[in-house]
Amino acid sequence: MNLKNKLKGFPTIYYTNLDHRNDRREYMETQFDYWGIKDYRRVSSSKYLSTEEEKWEHLVLDETLLFGSAAVANSITHIEMIKNWLETTDDEYMVMMEDDYDLSLIEYWNFDWEYLMNQIPINWDSVLLGFENKEYIPFFLHPFNYNHSFGPCLINRDYAKKIVKLHYFDGKFKLNIKINDERLKKVFGMADCFIPHSGVTYAIPLITNNPDFGSDYDLNGEPRGWFKECRDLYYEWWQKEHHKFTLNEFFNYGKPNDGGMVRHLKYMNKIKTIAYL
């Protein structure tokens, strides 16, 4: 294990960024430089702007969608990004993320990328390298939970082909592919839903968001009050708690002590209290 070069072999990162958000671009690329990440690509999120829906809405084959134009634009941007990756590289894997993620916790990883790749289950299609959840964060590798948010994501080539086959047809996009989970019916067709739910996805809490860039608001401008608390839990875990558990415990689930590696948010208790009052 090479802890002096933890990211050796890390796949190319594709990160999405609006053209006018140079602050976010500089933030991400400064982080990449700091960690010695040379293989990254910026993907413009401005090709499909929610404010210019009339320019691209004809490319969406769905007659009805349950979410706003910002989420639609984000979804077709991700599909096109994955398609372009398949057509322009022979890479086995890619990592996709948005431009508001904090890579600082890499400092505390007590393993390298090669070790991680040797630990993830053999049947994986995608692995979330970070996520938020309104209720709790399991600080170990585990199957993706429907209530997790979508975050930095590792996907393999076969799964990328499946996503494109499901959602891309002769230059147009079909988003609303049903997933038979009633808890998700309001987000069928969103990239946040179809990328983790169209195959076998695992989650591992490695990378957190940076709410200073407004990442605690969703694509419709609604506040996500739990994001900052999740970030605080990530920092608490990696700075103070992760050394209490072995790597074997961190990279496996279904253990007798899983409960001791879960951290609960106060956010939902606050919401319930407000509702009660």
Predicted segments with their positions:
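An acidic/histidine-cluster motif and surrounding catalytic segment
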Residues: 1-97, 101-277
